[in-house]
Amino acid sequence: MSEPIRVEKIIPKGQGLAKAVIARALELKLPFEIRNKSRFSETLSDGREAHFFLPRGNVLVDGDILVADDGSMIKVSAANQQVVTIASNDAHQLMKAAYHLGNRHIPTQLGKGFLRIEPDSVLEVMIRQLGLEAIHELAPFEPETGAYGGGHRHSHAETFDSDYALAQKVYAEHEKPHVHGPGCSHHHHGDHDHPHEH
């Protein structure tokens, strides 16, 4: 049995490679959970074992090309997996759902007329409370890769109202009675005793 190959390099979407070269690459179908990792092992379509040591902070997307230490090229495909699709003709309702999912840093795929997330019973209740349908299906999952990087998840033990409750707590703490004066550390809008030049 041959030694496992080592894979360390990513060519995003195969940029700069000829179509003929990409066509010869081995295909590797991976679910999002694996595409979100930098260290993993998989058996390739030619039967060889491959160990992946990819740069941290990357999320593999459909069409990325990986290069092994022996020169082999591997084309990443998003595998079908269990997902929840939120579809609607009402763009405003979808935007509300996207807002709440984004507020919880939930990896979310944005499509024309739909959102897609990984199954989560608490989130599905929230989606239904917003008047949308949450449909379980098998489909590729390709969430947006945004400012939050790899898409960490918060615990959903907190309730649907947790964000609002936190905001109210911060507001209440800020509004506690306090003395304004030379030792006051924050800026106040409104009353001030210096003239403005016009």
Curated annotation (Swiss-Prot):
Main location: cytoplasm
One of the record's GO cellular component terms: cytoplasm
Region annotated Disordered, chain positions: 176-198
Keyword annotations of the record: Chaperone, Cytoplasm, Nickel
UniProt subcellular location: Cytoplasm
CDD domains according to UniProt: UreE (cd00571)
MF (Gene Ontology): nickel cation binding; unfolded protein binding
GO biological process terms on file: protein folding; protein-containing complex assembly; urea metabolic process
Keyword flag Zinc: no
Family membership: Belongs to the UreE family.
NCBIfam families: PRK13261.1-1 (NF009751), PRK13263.1 (NF009762)
Full protein name: Urease accessory protein UreE
Organism listed in the record: Polynucleobacter asymbioticus (strain DSM 18221 / CIP 109841 / QLW-P1DMWA-1) (Polynucleobacter necessarius subsp. asymbioticus)
